């Protein structure tokens, strides 16, 4: 299905959007044991073509999980498959609420001509992060931030940024993050 620069996708449209309410500490387990396997299955079956997730609070912490459906006739199958895969986490009270919601694309942030490309990057990034999380779950917690920094550096290298450009970009992103989320560095004691 073509979704060029369309802003809003309601449940039943080509983007299916789940909110999985969970704890911050259980999120990785849900991503590794539930989300990743169901995504791999649906991709292998060619039922979905893209997916991505992000962690969010509104104010309750949850995983926002979106899939691009190849054919709307498969929506029932997708809902059933996701439901079956999430049952263990629900029964163990790792997930305490699941919502299917409306996906509103951030066209102002990513651009109407670039949103589909951005979603492809989100999908590739989500798949990469899930693969790494699967490996890191068996490692010391310190590996997590080291791997994150290495991934950021590799991405910067892919864009050919110099050390000065990397530092400038990180500073700009840091300021944007602080403004958007009200982050106060004075609260952190290092």
Task: Locate each region found by the language model.
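Extended low-complexity, compositionally biased segments
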Residues: 1-13, 19
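Short amphipathic alpha-helical segments
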Residues: 14-16, 61-63
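Internal, hydrophobic cores of structured domains that mediate oligomerization or house catalytic pockets
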Residues: 21, 25, 37-43, 47-58, ...
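Short N-terminal binding/cap micro-motifs at the start of the first secondary-structure element
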Residues: 26-31
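Short amphipathic alpha-helical segment that frequently serves as the phosphate-/nucleotide-binding helix
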Residues: 32-36
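Conserved small/polar residues in nucleotide/adenosyl-binding loops
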Residues: 188-190
């Amino acid at each position: 299905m073509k979704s060029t620069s369309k802003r809003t996708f309601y449940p039943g449209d080509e983007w299916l959007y789940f909110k999985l309410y969970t704890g911050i500490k259980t999120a990785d387990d849900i991503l590794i044991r539930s989300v990743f396997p169901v995504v791999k299955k649906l991709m292998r079956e060619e039922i979905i073509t893209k997916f991505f997730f992000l962690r969010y609070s509104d104010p309750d912490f949850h995983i926002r999980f979106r899939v691009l459906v190849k054919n709307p006739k498969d929506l029932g199958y997708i809902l059933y498959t996701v439901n079956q895969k999430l049952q263990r986490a629900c029964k163990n009270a790792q997930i305490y609420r699941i919502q299917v919601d409306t996906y509103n694309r951030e066209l102002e942030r990513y651009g109407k001509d670039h949103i589909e490309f951005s979603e492809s990057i989100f999908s590739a990034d989500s798949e990469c992060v899930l693969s790494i999380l699967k490996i890191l779950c068996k490692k010391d917690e310190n590996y997590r931030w080291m791997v994150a920094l290495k991934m950021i550096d590799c991405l910067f290298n892919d864009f050919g940024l110099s050390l000065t450009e990397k530092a400038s970009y990180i500073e700009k992103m840091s300021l944007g993050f602080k403004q958007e989320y009200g982050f106060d560095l004075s609260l952190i004691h290092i």
